[in-house]
Design a protein with these regions (language model features):
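Conserved catalytic region of serine esterases and O-acyltransferases that act on ester linkages
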Residues: 207, 385, 389-396, 402-444
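Alpha-helical cap/lid subdomain in secreted, periplasmic
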Residues: 263-391
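Surface-exposed, low-complexity/disordered Ser/Thr/Gly/Pro/Asn-rich loops and linkers
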Residues: 49-98, 191-193
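Conserved SGNH/GDSL esterase-like catalytic core that processes O-acyl groups on lipids
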Residues: 210-212, 218-302, 308
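Bacterial Sec-dependent N-terminal signal peptides
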Residues: 1-22
Length: 444
């Protein structure tokens, strides 16, 4: 088989000992190509440890010459695929003990769209490729149905039975159906939301709960659900997560999207985190209210219908950094409702008021991320919670959201081996302490 290798640059890192709370990870972050005529964009590789050599890579392995295979800053890595072809994700690793759990996340589109397509997701354990999930009678374990606008997420965790002294952690997505396909594996992003592998410490989880995340870019920037999963693991809990996210999506949009509805209808969830578009709650009760509370109620009904045991969780999001910035298509609201956009504090207070009332009305849990956000801004302005666009969350912001979500579910102080993820220990500890103060002590 021929290999089309799409290289990623690995930053040189010193040797680090694999400690109980260290988290080897691979993330692919895209940069714009220096020459747009080149077939492949340049990539920047960040955050791997304790790996000290080699390159992380995304490869397409195929039986014959592909018709098209490019990287670009909009679509992704694309190839014409036939049965037996596969995408290969590799992360260099050293001294990874047997029993390590590896969490893998990516997103892809398949064409023809609006059809079910079958793949086998596998991982390398020693010298053997093993199914990441049980295979069915056709040799597959993963079905994707996508549209042009809505990629399908692929998120799973496996446990390695073999030690890796020096080698690669590897996953592959192999086509099992005969029909030729066009497969696009979505680009790594500077916002850090796609194509990741994270290794968890070698422990046995005390319990397993199944989670659903329904949201938008305030969910997927820096993958706060993945950080939540990492935090839970270090505290001894396995979070089995599913997700449907699309930028700018409101609850109304989720209700009308068949892919979003299908994820909800899979059922079996213990908790469902519901995140409305960040401007919508401000408009509650105004002439521009398009049924904001009603639509949240309908989504809660759907969750309870397919997962009767589930506890829906409404998330309080955060205000824009300056209150009136980065409004995009909602810019016209500044003149109509200036009282909501005076500054950050004004916007945040309105979000807290409306979303708290929604949770009370529908009898749901509440994830008070916005309250914790406000405390951090007041106490530690040196911790930048925002991405450079001044409204999406930075990695620190995602970590805070994940820590609050963890406290909402488990309501117990973090242990002494809590996960810091990519943050320095002092910053992570402070953000966790704020999550505890807000959820466990009711601080506002």
């Amino acid at each position: 088989m021929k290999r089309l290798l799409l290289p990623l640059i690995l930053l040189a890192l010193p040797l680090m000992v694999y400690a109980e709370n260290s988290t080897p990870r691979a993330e692919w972050v895209m940069t714009k190509p220096s020459d747009k005529n080149k077939a492949a964009a340049e990539f920047l590789k960040t955050g791997i440890y304790p790996a000290t050599y080699g390159e992380a890579s995304l490869s397409f392995i195929h039986k014959k010459r592909v018709a098209k295979s490019t990287l670009n800053d909009k679509g992704g890595a694309q190839a014409e695929s036939v049965k037996g072809d596969y995408w290969l994700f590799e992360m260099p690793a050293e001294n990874i003990p047997a029993g390590t759990v590896v969490d893998f996340w990516t997103q892809l589109n398949t064409s023809p769209t609006e059809e079910n397509h079958r793949f086998a997701l596998e991982y390398l354990d020693g010298k053997k490729w093993l199914p990441a999930m049980p295979l069915d009678k056709d040799g597959g374990n993963y079905t994707t149905t996508t549209s042009d606008k809505h990629p399908r997420r692929l998120w799973c965790a496996i446990r390695l039975s073999k030690e890796i002294k020096k080698g690669n952690i590897a996953f592959r997505l192999r086509q099992v159906e005969d029909k030729p396909l066009t497969v696009t594996v979505h680009n790594p992003s500077p916002r850090g939301q796609l194509n990741q592998m994270v290794c968890y410490k070698n422990v046995e989880a005390r319990d397993t709960l199944k989670y659903l995340f329904i949201g938008n870019s305030y969910t997927y920037y820096h993958t706060y659900p993945m950080i939540f999963k990492e935090i839970a693991w270090h505290e001894g809990h396995y979070a089995d997560c599913d997700i449907f996210i699309s930028g700018g999506y409101t609850m109304k949009a989720h209700l009308s999207n068949k892919y979003s509805r299908a994820v909800v209808a899979e059922g079996g969830y213990d908790y469902a985190f519901l995140q409305d578009q960040s401007i919508q709650p401000l408009l509650n009760g105004t002439p521009d209210d398009s049924g904001i509370t009603e639509n949240m109620g309908k989504m809660i009904e759907q969750v309870r219908k397919y997962s009767p045991q589930a506890k829906p969780v409404i998330e309080i999001t955060w205000g824009r950094k300056h209150g009136n910035n980065a409004l995009g298509k909602y810019e016209y609201l500044l003149e109509k409702y200036p009282q909501f956009f005076t500054d950050y504090e004004t916007m945040q207070a309105r979000l807290i008021e409306v979303l708290t009332a929604e949770a009370e009305q529908f009898g749901t849990e509440l994830s008070p991320v916005g309250i914790a956000w406000r405390i951090v801004r007041r106490e530690r302005p040196d911790i930048e919670l925002y991405w450079k666009d001044a409204h999406h969350q930075s990695y620190s912001g995602s970590y805070l959201a994940a820590a609050v979500a963890y406290q909402v579910i488990y309501r117990t102080p973090f242990g002494e081996n809590a996960a810091n993820a990519k943050l320095d220990a002092k910053t992570a500890a402070y953000l966790r302490s704020v999550a505890e103060r807000v959820v466990l002590q009711g601080e506002r």
